[in-house]
């Protein structure tokens, strides 16, 4: 099977959203267990199904030992051209505000920019709705590829702890990261503060480029240092305690949005 023919197809790994003639990645099956929804998937007539299970209808399946590894391999080829300046913002509170203010500031200064997060997908003063703080991996990649084609090289993404644990930022590298704050939250999912912090630190351990910048305050800097993040090849840009040279001229609020 030629790789070129595969990367020309739209990708999917969610059987609920699968469309006809898309390339489907079966992350559920393994050598011994088959995906319980495989019949429903076949009814949707995908182009091919990448799987680890030896199904009988061989003409419709591509057998791979590790589907996830093959998925990442194809993604790197299909999405090789993405915006150069990617910023990730994480933290218990403030992610949405920071992402939205970043987008507004660059837009006001006539710098093409995009934002992905709780409020949705923003680019060139346009908007698309999103149901998740950090959308799934393919939605992010498709959006970033789209804005790159429209000459947008700056984008900020909200990196939620759920999204980080679930690998929604796979195949992305960030030059800059912002850690707003850290306090008790989402313990129904993470079970403990240690687990919650570990989820946040995935961003800094896995998705930052070398010599990237981490923007945070003194408390977060100490937290990162304690977890050996600052020992890596990063620049820590600490929040200044001095008065900032900004003045609030006006602001308007609408639903979840605030415009400064």
Model-found features: residue ranges?
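Pocket-edge positions in alpha/beta enzyme catalytic cores
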Residues: 30, 62-63, 132-135, 188, ...
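Phosphate-binding loop of NTP-binding sites
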Residues: 70-212, 222-223, 228
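Active-site regions of enzymes building and remodeling cell-envelope glycoconjugates
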Residues: 2, 47, 57-68, 128-131, ...
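Adenine nucleotide phosphate-binding catalytic loops in nucleotide-utilizing enzymes
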Residues: 2-6, 137, 184, 190-197, ...
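N-terminal leader/targeting and accessory segments in enzymes
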Residues: 1-73, 77, 247
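A short helix->loop->beta-strand "cap" motif at the edges of active sites that frequently abuts
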Residues: 44-49, 59, 83-84, 207-213, ...
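Short, polar loop motifs at secondary-structure junctions
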Residues: 47-57, 117-120, 217-222, 240
């Amino acid at each position: 099977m030629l790789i070129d023919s595969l990367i020309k197809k739209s990708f999917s790994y969610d059987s609920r959203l699968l469309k006809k003639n898309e390339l489907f990645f079966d992350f559920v099956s393994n050598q011994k267990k088959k995906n319980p929804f495989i019949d429903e998937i076949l009814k949707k007539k995908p182009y091919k199904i990448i799987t680890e299970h030896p199904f009988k209808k061989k003409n419709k399946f591509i057998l791979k030992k590790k589907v996830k590894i093959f998925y990442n391999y194809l993604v790197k080829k299909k999405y090789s051209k993405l915006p150069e300046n990617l910023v990730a913002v994480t933290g218990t509170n403030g992610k949405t505000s920071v992402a939205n203010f970043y987008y507004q500031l660059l837009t006001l200064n006539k710098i093409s920019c995009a934002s992905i997060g709780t409020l949705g997908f923003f680019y060139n003063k346009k908007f698309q709705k999103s149901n998740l703080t950090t959308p799934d991996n393919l939605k992010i990649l498709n959006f970033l590829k789209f804005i790159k084609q429209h000459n947008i090289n700056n984008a900020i993404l909200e990196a939620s702890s759920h999204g980080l644990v679930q690998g929604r930022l796979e195949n992305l590298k960030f030059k800059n990261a912002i850690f707003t704050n850290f306090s008790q939250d989402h313990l129904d999912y993470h079970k403990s503060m240690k687990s919650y912090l570990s989820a946040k630190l995935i961003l800094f351990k896995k998705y930052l480029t070398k010599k990237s910048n981490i923007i945070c305050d003194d408390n977060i800097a100490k937290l990162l240092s304690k977890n050996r993040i600052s020992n890596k090849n990063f620049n820590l840009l600490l929040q200044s305690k001095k008065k900032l040279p900004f003045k609030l001229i006006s602001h308007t609020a609408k639903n979840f949005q605030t415009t400064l």
